[in-house]
Every structure is written in structure tokens, then in C-alpha cells.
Amino acid sequence: MGQLRDRMDADLRLRGLSENTRRLYLRCARDFAAYCGRSPAVVGTEEVRAFLRHLVDTRRAPSTCGVYAAALRFLYDVTLDRPP
């Protein structure tokens, strides 16, 4: 996820997001990539939904699930400029 991570970090910086938010969003993207076993750039909507369901099924707090959803939305809407 090296180049994609760098692009996402640059986009987060351009938006003026705090260091903590940038780290959190990048960690969310990394966790998603690890779950999928491949780059988020080649993953579709069903994998995103499956990952978010996985978070709920593993009893993550609703606020945590919301952060992951926001981070993935940023990744796809801003960095990749495409729907998942």
C-alpha cells in the first residue's frame, strides 16, 4: 500500500486534517488492505461492505465503525476518486 498510502497522506494534509486524524485514517486504510489481502485500489464495494460488517460482527464500537467508514469514504472519494 506504499504509493497509495503516500497519496492518501498527501490528500489528508491538503485538507488540513490533524496529525491524529491522518494517522487514524491511514491505519484504517491499512487494516482494510490487510483484511482484503490486496490493495484497496483493486477492491470493490462488496469487500468494503464485508469489512464494515466484520467490524460490527467483531463487536467494534459504533464510533469505531464510523471512523473506519469515514476513512474508507475519504480513500475512495478523494484519493482514488472513484466508488469502491
Predicted regions and their residues:
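Intrinsically disordered, low-complexity and often Lys/Arg-enriched segments
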Residues: 1-2
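N-terminal core-binding DNA-recognition domain of tyrosine recombinases/integrases
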Residues: 5-84
